[in-house]
């Protein structure tokens, strides 16, 4: 049984495997509610409004920020991303475990609003492996890869700010560690 109403924040650099790990976690623990972020970026193939993200034009996103409607937000790679506040608070009040998969600046903002949130940093086994994974995606220009790698160095330097660090070397082991940190029992 999950510890009801616990907020867990998962952060890590681009290419570390957050998406894969979260998908496995949700497959095994349907009681977890994964927050859906709002973004100003364009949808990618296969992404659905309200499932993958809430896609907003910049003026709508800025209005959400001004109204206090986002728990956290940041600009990354020329796009804005943020966590809508109301659904997070509603699910926590209903006693559900809530997971935020967000970037470093967002995690720092959540620390202010929800100091009891448990924050987990997902780290690669090495920087070389992270670079291999990012390049292996085949979706970015060399310029974009260099920006992601520079950002990853900054993020890796911040991992001591987190309550726990999980190294994503072996997916099954990383999943077990995340389940433990989230106070979940293996299915």
UniProtKB/Swiss-Prot annotation:
Its EC number is 2.7.4.8. Pathway: Purine metabolism. PROSITE patterns: GUANYLATE_KINASE_1, GUANYLATE_KINASE_2. It comes from the Bacteria. Its main location: cytoplasm. It is found in: Cytoplasm. GO terms for cellular component: cytosol. It catalyses: GMP + ATP = GDP + ADP; dZMP + ATP = dZDP + ADP. ATP binds at residues 12-19. Residues 5-183 form the Guanylate kinase-like domain. One of its GO terms (molecular function) is ATP binding. Keywords: ATP-binding, Cytoplasm, Kinase, Nucleotide-binding, Transferase. Belongs to the guanylate kinase family. Essential for recycling GMP and indirectly, cGMP. (Microbial infection) Catalyzes the phosphorylation of dZMP to dZDP, when the bacterium is infected by a phage that produces the substrate for the synthesis of dZTP (2- amino-2'-deoxyadenosine 5'-triphosphate), which is then used by the phage as a DNA polymerase substrate. PANTHER family: GUANYLATE KINASE, GUANYLATE KINASE-RELATED. NCBIfam families: guanyl_kin. HAMAP family: Guanylate_kinase. This is Guanylate kinase. It comes from Synechococcus sp. (strain CC9902). The lineage of its organism: Bacteria, Bacillati, Cyanobacteriota, Cyanophyceae, Synechococcales.
């Amino acid at each position: 049984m999950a510890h009801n109403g616990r907020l867990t924040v998962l952060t890590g650099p681009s290419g570390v495997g957050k998406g894969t790990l979260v998908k496995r976690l949700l497959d095994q623990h349907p009681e977890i509610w994964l927050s859906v972020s709002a973004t100003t970026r364009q949808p990618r193939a296969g992404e659905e409004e309200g499932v993958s993200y809430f896609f907003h034009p910049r003026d709508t996103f800025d209005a959400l920020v001004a109204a206090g409607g986002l728990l956290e937000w940041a600009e990354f790679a020329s796009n804005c991303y943020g966590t809508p506040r109301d659904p997070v608070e509603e699910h926590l009040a209903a006693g559900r475990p809530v997971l935020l998969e967000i970037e470093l600046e967002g995690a720092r903002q959540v620390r202010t609003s929800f100091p009891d949130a448990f924050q987990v940093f997902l780290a690669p086994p090495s920087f070389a492996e992270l670079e291999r994974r990012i390049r292996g995606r085949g979706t970015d220009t060399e310029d974009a890869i260099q920006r992601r790698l520079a950002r990853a160095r900054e993020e890796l330097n911040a991992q001591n700010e987190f309550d726990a660090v999980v190294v994503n070397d072996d997916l099954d082991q990383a999943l077990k560690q995340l389940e433990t940190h989230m106070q979940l029992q293996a299915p």
